[in-house]
């Protein structure tokens, strides 16, 4: 094999590896894509304190969470709106992992009672993990602070 043929072979191998790597989806990106582009409605807030129990959301359509493909989250919090960044890091098959939200900016309209909007906005800053199961999204708060249950929003 001549030097020119070895050079062509080496260039072909390098080019093939580069193209293959560019087409491959890293695990972190693929899991983020499981959340990216999805929308959810809040149905319940489960407290780890038995005295508080579970708070059911009367109208789930008034509390929505949308994960954008750009790493931004959009929220409807009763009569308010919010947005902020998010970062998902998968564990295992991607149906669970760590999830954190950046600062959430919200409008400040005074919603009618019960006032869950402020609680949800505040608690999103304490989310540490997620679980996708049976068309539901569970967000766990740090220090056993509770679990938010969301159902997939109809398209």
Report residues per predicted region.
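Sec-dependent N-terminal signal peptides
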Residues: 8-15
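Lipid interaction determinants
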Residues: 3, 12, 20-155
């Amino acid at each position: 094999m001549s030097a020119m043929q070895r050079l062509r072979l080496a260039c072909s191998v390098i080019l093939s590896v580069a193209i293959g790597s560019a087409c491959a989806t890293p695990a972190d990106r693929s899991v983020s894509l499981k959340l990216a582009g999805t929308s959810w409605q809040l149905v319940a807030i489960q407290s780890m304190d038995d005295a508080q129990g579970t708070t059911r959301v009367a109208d789930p359509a008034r509390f929505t969470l949308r994960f954008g493909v750009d790493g931004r989250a959009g929220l409807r919090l009763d009569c308010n709106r919010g947005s902020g960044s998010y970062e998902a890091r998968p564990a295992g098959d991607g149906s669970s992992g760590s999830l954190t939200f950046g600062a959430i900016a919200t409008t400040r309209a005074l919603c009618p009672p019960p006032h869950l909007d402020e609680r949800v906005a505040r608690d999103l800053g304490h989310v540490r993990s997620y679980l996708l199961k049976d068309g539901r999204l569970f967000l766990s708060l740090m220090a056993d602070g509770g679990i938010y249950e969301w159902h997939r929003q109809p398209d």
